[in-house]
């Protein structure tokens, strides 16, 4: 018997749970639409990275197998088989929601169903907003198929010259920055590509449009960087980003159009060359023909529309923790260690802390790591302001996938402001989230530390659940000072801390030691691990051994879980759960009954434990330990948004009509009640 679930199929099962939220009829319609958008965006990234990686292994005949022993070719086939039915489910769900939205006055209307007045408005919109932006290409001997960047959205048409009757083909690129949903009248939307298609004869004069189809390509978007050869890491990353759009096509999505047109499109894709003059390899490319609009990720335009509040979930306003109501946040932290649970407790104190430090003459230095900060960052702006007055040192991780460009921009801005900027660490990704502020008061140095499971990003802090920790304890500050020094001197691989634990050297051995300690207590042992993913085979094997010793183990794993629970003789004392709700579960909390409770930036994956700089923080304060355990206990009682994984790999929704509990709603209400 195989002891592990396949990683890729486990991820797909997570995305299925996201799709299930779109099917939840108790949710407002635009909330359901939001989950369809998330589903598609997730799947885009899965193809750009995971499927692209498997395709590379297969094409280069690299003998690499998944944790379950499946070859790249087998995994690609399993992925295609898994998605074949689910893509149809997604389309049906969109059509159901679309029909319900129509009844509520939000109409996504096909162009051919518009009346004459509405078509006249569409024509005006085409002339004023689209005509100058679309890129039409007639494909002939002097105009070959142009390069297609990752996530290119385009139309492919068969056209006939009215004079010569010669049939040829045309490509019309639609830029990503145009509005996809064009509101012709209040509540009446038409897709931009349908407006363009209806006016193709204005782009190809003296031609008749015979057939047309919309299509979208997904390409390999992983960035390969040879760090050994890097003299200027920022410059190397900048050049690598420019190559991202030149990756091989891994997926083709098409909408309507004849089979003949699809065959011609495929032949055209096979013949064209990229900027690097390497032909695209379409071997094993996944092709999906859609009955609905392509790229449901663009549904965010409707979800965020200001006119349909009645169709959305009410906005929750994060509450300010009462200990942070004082004007001087540093005094609050000196009084006691504090732990916030975002988004229920506001992220604002984190921003305020940096802003207060920047304006306080007593502040000597600010040290910080930045992983994903977003395009508009008040935190970076505060650091830029501080850099003109005090010592500011920032490690900006340029290898944060899909945030590389934003991080590079902020790193350059910080450098221009006078901050010391470090661009990551050689062969390691810095994923630890930490802030250290040093002040001088009463002729003494005082250190203030903030550590978090989530990013320094106010926007994600409103939709991700994370915990963040504030402390003025010297033993914690000393470890963070040591860690920052190791990052600046590129010695993080071999560094070890005293109070905290860091990867790649300490976290995995510590977690194994904690599991072994619970094994010593056999049936009295109890472990709860809450993480985004559980993939590390060594940790899974130790959990199996603990189960066989009688230790009760509850795992709350939001996404990928390669461990097989409830298998007789192997894991019958292990139960695996997953919570998917309106907030993305992101906090990592690790509880060991006979030792302590910890929170961490690290998931239980080889990449986090062996190839990243991460932190594991023990909750030595009883109040904080109790708060963390309470989070776990409530989530284990969730009967509305919790799934249980069975031994066959299926996720079954937990239900108890007599005791309905949505853990995320519970924490919202608790925040309102407490504050």
Curated annotation (Swiss-Prot):
InterPro entries in UniProt: PP_kinase, PP_kinase_C_1, PP_kinase_middle, PP_kinase_middle_dom_sf, PPK_C_dom2, PPK_N_dom, PPK_N_dom_sf
Pfam families listed in its UniProt record: PP_kinase, PP_kinase_C, PP_kinase_C_1, PP_kinase_N
Binding positions (Mg(2+)): 372, 401
The EC number(s) this enzyme carries: 2.7.4.1
Obligatory cofactor(s): Mg(2+)
Active site: 431 (phosphohistidine intermediate)
Modifications after synthesis and translation: An intermediate of this reaction is the autophosphorylated ppk in which a phosphate is covalently linked to a histidine residue through a N-P bond.
Keyword Magnesium: yes
Keyword Nucleotide-binding part of the UniProt annotation: yes
Family: Belongs to the polyphosphate kinase 1 (PPK1) family.
Protein name: Polyphosphate kinase
